[in-house]
Amino acid sequence: MAKKRLHSFSWVPDLLHQKDNYFLTPVEKLAEKIELIANCPQVVYNQGELCSCTANAIGESIEYILIKGKKAVFAPSRLFIYYTERRMEGTIHEDAGAMIRDGIKSVNKEGA
């Protein structure tokens, strides 16, 4: 019988950074409704019990941007993103989740 995992790691909240910028817009300027489905990737990934939610979100975002921009589409390696973001955080030997900021930095530096 398979053992149930007892830990509940997932997304790790980002720490505030002096370079953070906040985007605010008046509510009246926002569209009432937008349709995003046309640009969504067709494959839905199941990360199972792996705590790689930030890597999956980043990989899906990359695919979305490529489809929307009518660029050559590829499936970014979610495991590579997960590994490199944990390497930045010093947790490569743990299934510890990661900060989305580190995932984005890792894609910028290492690729996907």
Regions from the PLM with identified roles:
Residues M1-A112:
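Catalytic-core signature of thiol
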